[in-house]
């Protein structure tokens, strides 16, 4: 009894810490997004959004091959050699890369945008790494403090600089550098030891996980990246604002669960309870479908009027918003399933599935965007992540229940623009019934294995 109570307290503490960190992100977004969208024209806001997106790619390219393997082999607070190795590797790679990126913009008159990309990327990488360290060492409140520090510094800096008419890209870069300072302040002390250390993980694992993460991010942002050459700047700003809204709402909710659960599921797997871990992951996928369905239904019932009160008129397009909500849910399902391949050390499956989904999905997104503008970009993103999730299910031994729920959900959202509001809500309700049925079946499996 005492053991179960201790475990429950650990879960509660972790969930509370992550919740506080996510709420801080939402509050920051509630401050930042309306200010920027009201102060800036859609064209100006689009330039800031694109700088942030490219900065994310900088972070992925320079840091993910180190951060993701560290997440699988984190060591502990008592054994910090892996942390020391990862810290040194990141410094050696990221700092020279940032200098090269900034200098690369000089010949083309693009120093400002390149500074924004490099600064934002450094901030995201540093903040993500330190937060990951604390999370995997089961120190959730240190994790929360790290994220809140980074989020707060980035938000305050970018809003303050934009309000005093600093160039948007420069503001983005300065905000990223401010969060680097915060990450360094809250970082654990490095372990003493030899300056040279053998890599704790294989090169193939790091590269495979990094390529999978890069492909995932490309699918997330590809629509925003190609829209400037296909539609007007106003539509680019609309799409960027809706994408950020989805990321900071349903994306934040799903991210909370993902963040809390992964370290504990990895611990459960390492203890030898592999079947139970797989069943939990399957259940998470179905619950994600339910969250997506209820989110779509809630937006349909409320309409765009409430959202326009926050953003101002002309930012929200309902079919686009619904497709982006569904794409976020599908992407999280794929991420959950990828945990199986990470835990089994089959990282090549993540690489292959993600790259194939990205190739096919990006081609679909281009074609759909050419035909339907921002609606096509959102639908292409949904198709990309649906394919990503289905490919990840191969060789995962998770069964068909999450697949059934996912396909029902995607079908309902995809046919939405062809139906009137009432018919679409009825179909969405039917998808909820299907997902609930699969959820109950999987829950019985979890209960039996426990």
Regions found by a protein language model. Give the residues of each.
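Transmembrane helical elements of multi-pass membrane transporters/channels
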Residues: 13-25, 29, 150, 170-186, ...
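Helix-loop junctions and terminal segments of transmembrane helices
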Residues: 60-78, 242, 246-285, 338-343
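Hydrophobic transmembrane helix module of multi-pass membrane transport proteins
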Residues: 89-213
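Alpha-helical transmembrane segments of polytopic membrane transporters and translocases
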Residues: 30-34, 45-62, 223-224, 237-254, ...
């Amino acid at each position: 009894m005492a053991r179960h109570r201790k475990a429950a307290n650990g879960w509660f503490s972790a969930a509370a810490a992550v919740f506080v960190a996510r709420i801080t992100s939402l509050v920051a977004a509630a401050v930042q997004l309306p200010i920027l969208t009201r102060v800036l024209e859609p064209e100006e806001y689009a330039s800031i959004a694109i700088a942030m997106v490219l900065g994310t790619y900088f972070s992925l390219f320079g840091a993910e091959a180190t951060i993701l393997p560290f997440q699988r082999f984190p060591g502990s607070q008592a054994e910090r050699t892996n942390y020391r190795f990862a810290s040194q590797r990141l410094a050696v790679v990221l700092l020279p890369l940032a200098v090269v990126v900034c200098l690369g913009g000089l010949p083309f008159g693009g120093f400002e945008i390149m500074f924004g990309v490099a600064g934002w990327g450094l901030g995201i990488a540093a903040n993500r790494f330190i937060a990951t360290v604390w999370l995997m060492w089961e120190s959730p409140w240190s994790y929360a403090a790290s994220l809140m520090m980074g989020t707060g510094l980035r938000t305050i800096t970018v809003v303050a600089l934009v309000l005093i008419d600093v160039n948007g890209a420069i503001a983005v870069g300065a905000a990223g550098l401010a969060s680097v300072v915060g990450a360094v302040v809250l970082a654990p002390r490095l372990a003493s030891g030899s300056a040279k250390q053998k890599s704790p993980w294989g090169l193939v694992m790091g590269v495979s996980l990094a390529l999978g993460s890069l492909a995932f991010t490309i699918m997330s942002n590809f629509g925003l990246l190609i829209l400037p050459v296909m539609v007007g700047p106003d539509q680019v700003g609309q799409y960027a604002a809706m994408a950020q809204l989805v990321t900071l709402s349903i994306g934040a909710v799903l991210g909370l669960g993902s963040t809390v659960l992964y370290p504990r599921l990895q611990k459960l797997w390492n203890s030898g309870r592999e079947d139970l871990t797989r069943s939990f992951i399957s259940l998470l996928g179905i619950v994600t479908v339910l969250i997506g369905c209820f989110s779509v239904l809630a937006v349909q019932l409320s309409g765009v009027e409430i959202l326009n009160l926050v953003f101002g008129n002309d930012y929200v397009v309902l079919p686009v918003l619904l497709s982006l909500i569904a794409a976020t849910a599908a992407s999280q399902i794929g991420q959950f399933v990828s945990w199986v391949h990470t835990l089994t050390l089959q990282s090549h499956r993540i690489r292959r599935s993600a790259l194939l989904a990205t190739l096919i999905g990006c081609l679909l997104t281009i074609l759909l965007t050419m035909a339907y503008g921002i609606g096509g970009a959102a639908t292409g993103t949904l198709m990309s992540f649906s394919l990503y999730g289905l490919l990840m299910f191969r060789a995962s031994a998770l069964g068909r229940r999450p697949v059934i729920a996912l396909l029902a959900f995607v079908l309902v959202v995809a046919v939405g623009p062809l139906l009137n509001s009432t018919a679409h809500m009825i179909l969405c309700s039917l998808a909820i019934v299907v997902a609930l049925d699969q959820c109950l079946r999987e829950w019985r499996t979890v209960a039996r294995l426990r």
